[in-house]
Structures are given as C-alpha cells and as structure tokens.
Amino acid sequence: MPIAIMLDTKGPEYRIKTFENGKIELKDGDTFTLTTDDIVGNQKRVSVNYENLIKDLKVGDRVLVANGIIILQVRELKGNDAICDVIAGGTLSDRKSMNFPNKVMKHAYLSKQDKDDLLFGIKNEVDYVAASFVSTKQDVADLRSFLDENGGEDIEIIAKIENRSGVDHVEEICEIANGIMIARGDLGVEIPGVEVPAIQKYLINKCRMLGTRVITATEMLESMIHNPRPTRAELSDVANAVYDGSSAIMLSGESAAGKYPVEAVKNMAETAEYTEKQINYGKRFANAEFQTKSIVDAISHATCAMAIDVDAKCIVVSSLTGRTVRMVSRFRCPVDIIGMTTSEKAWRKLNLSWGVKPVLCEEYNSMEVMFYNAMNEAKSVMKLK
C-alpha cells in the first residue's frame, strides 16, 4: 500500500506575546488592551505579533483569544492600541492564539516560517501540502506560485477550511486547490459550534459535485488521546463523515500525541470499513448531480455507468499523472477502480482518491502491452480468475 506524505503549514497565525508573570486573570466587564507596541504584558495590556492589527480592526469587532475561551470586543482604537471590553473572561497565559470571526485580515499569506517549511518539503519530496487558514483563491494561488518557482510543481495542495471566508469562497478555492480539508477545530472557534455540522455537510456535498477530494478532520476520536476506547458519539461522528461522502477521514492529536495511536487508527479504520458496506453507492450514483465540464469528465461518468450496467468487477484506468484516475474516482462508482501508473509519485498520491487501488507498473511501449498488463494487474489485485 503506497503511503503519501503531507506537510502541514503553520499558516497566518495571530498570537499575543508574554506576561510579566506568565499569565493573568480576566473578569467579565474588565477593560483589556491589545497593542502592537513591544511591551511585556500585564493585567491591563499585552503585545500582539501582528503589526497591522489596528488597521484591520474596527469598533465592535470581536477577538477570540485562547481558542475562543476569552472573548474581547473592541471599544476604541487609539494609536497602536485596541481597547477592548472583556465579554467572557478567564485565565490568559503567554502566546495564546487570537481569532477574528468573520474577518479577512490583510496580510501576506506566506510567512518566512511557511516558506522555509515549504522549501524543506520540496527538498524531501513531500506529496501534499496542507495549506492552513486558506481564506480566498488568492491564498492558494500564492502558495502554488511559490511551489512552482522552487521545484515543487508536482506537490498538490490541500486547502484547509478553517474560517468563514474559506467556507464562503470554497468553490473558487476548489478551482485551483487539489482538495480541501475541513479542519473542524479552528473552524469551530471562528464559527459558532452549532453551525459546524451543517457546514461540514455543505462542504462535502459541494466537493462531491465539483469532483474535489475532501478530508474531514479534527477531534474525531478526541477521547482516545487519553483513553483506550472511543465514545459511541465519536464512532458516530466518524461514520457520519463517511456517510456524508468524505474522500478521507483524519486523526490528529489522537495519533500524533495520544497514548493509544494504534488503537485510534484501528477503531477509525474498522468504523469506516463497516460504514462503507452499509451505503448503496449504486443508488447514490444514479441520483447524484455532477458538474461535468469536460470531455474527460463525460467519458469518466460514462465509464462508471457502463461498469454498473454490465456488473463489472473493476475498472482499470491507466494514467501517468493520476488525473484520469481521479476523474473516474470522483463519481463514487460502486465498482473498484485500479489506478495504474508508471510514476511513483502519482502512485503515492492516488491513495487519497476514493475507491482507488493504486498500482505501480513498468513503462510500456504499446497499447497491447498496456492492456495485457492491465488484465494481469486486475486479476492480481482483485483476485480474479
């Protein structure tokens, strides 16, 4: 089984700086100031790492600090200071994150840290870049240009949707991104939590219509960071992401820092496999509406329909880059797809495409050899006679 490597960028990150004693206590109704002046924080004010903060804010804006635990509302903008009312208080410690609901901050999308990380990824031949906090199509375009200019033309971009702007612009983002990730953790800070399930379903459905790969991620088996077994609610969450039509589902803290990483992967895989068997993909295919825009789309759709009509055991697709395989995969045909390619990089990346069994094969110099190899691979992979 090929394994692709994804590099996760830091993305635009807004944080407060440090306090004299490491932390303070804020109470509802307090006045607290965010400043671009370089100071050591105290009970009344703290520095931020974003120099254009005052230009981007306006009176009445809300600032969510420490993953939304603390809520500030801008009362006055004065010089380098944003003077705020504390709407929801709590303990505030060094270097906590800031979020700005329903705002697009005017910043360069790629920081120096991001560029250094991307150059590392290019040097080490990663397959995907997960682009954090994508707000608009231009963010993806800036990343694509940087990759192309530095030898990363083959690296594909997965745009992480983590704010309202990303949701609102998802269709144009999908025009140039190679897929999206629904990063529900930060999305649930930027957007009221009650909206996240509906937004998840909207984004997955939109991607299915557009033929774009979509990963559902974050807090899927969160309790398994500390516990050997998931809750029933978490298993239902995993299953619902599969029912909705996710191309892939993803663990984060559970496998990166949890006590039971193997058990978490096993529980997620077993739940996904069982759920897949309960879905009537033939019925979904017959009732689905797709945005077919090209001859390749039309041929791919017809291939799936024909495979269903003749009760084919599998569909074999040969492709150098993997693009044609992905075009067939987008229709979620209830027939296994064998994706043959001579490119090791394409072979690894095809593992993210729904319903595809990637096969790395030798180069061929004629159609006859290609068909012969395809038949042999189909028999081997599908255990056909």
Q: Predicted regions span which residues?
A:
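Non-catalytic helical/linker scaffolds that mediate oligomerization, partner binding
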Residues: 1-385
